[in-house]
A protein has these predicted regions:
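Glycine- and acidic-residue-enriched helix-capping/strand-helix junction motifs
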Residues: 16-25
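Short Asp/Glu-rich motifs
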Residues: 20, 50-53, 136
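A short beta-strand-loop structural module common to alpha/beta enzyme folds
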Residues: 38-49
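A short, charged/proline- and glycine-enriched loop
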Residues: 2-8, 92
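Nucleotide-activated donor-dependent transferases that construct or modify glycoconjugates
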Residues: 6-17
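Charged, often glycine-rich, active-site loop that binds/positions anionic groups
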Residues: 48-77
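Glycine-rich beta-alpha loop elements in corrinoid/cobalamin-binding modules
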Residues: 24, 28-32, 44-46, 73-143
Length: 143
């Protein structure tokens, strides 16, 4: 993964079906690279699957239905979120763009950006079809 002086890091945030990976970040990457910027994609949806394996359905439920209360799952989610933040901080892009593909991505976006803002000082852009419901677009902007 390109990390030296990276302009833009695009992130696919959980949770969306693995059988239909979102194409938005790939299309955006092509456009920003054509415009002369360096860019890479981080697929946190796939990373969640890789980190949870046979327990993936529990985490799918956690992020899509907000079914909380299992201390073990809560602790694992916290560890996973921390690992994602640490990865972004290590990459240290000038801009992080988070693709909120569906409204099922909103909880992961809120949890991730809350932690990310504590350690990452670059620009953060949130966009996608899933931000238009329940006020996530206005709740997490900084203008």
């Amino acid at each position: 993964m390109l990390t030296d002086n990276l302009d833009i890091l695009l992130i696919n945030i959980p949770i969306s079906g693995l059988q239909y990976p979102p194409a938005g970040t790939s299309q955006l990457k092509g456009s920003v690279v054509d415009a002369g910027f360096t860019c890479t994609i981080l697929d946190l949806n796939l990373d969640l699957f890789n980190k949870t394996g046979s327990d993936y359905s529990k985490f799918f439920d956690y992020f899509s239905e907000a079914t909380h209360g299992d201390p073990e799952i809560d602790a694992r989610v916290d560890q996973i979120l921390d690992s994602w933040v640490d990865n972004v901080v290590k990459i240290n892009p000038r801009v992080v763009g988070i693709s909120v593909f569906t409204m099922m991505c909103q909880l992961a976006t809120r949890l991730f950006t809350k932690k990310l803002k504590q350690k990452y000082t670059g620009k953060l852009v949130i966009g996608g079809a899933g931000i238009s419901t329940n006020g996530i677009a206005s709740a997490y902007n900084d203008f």
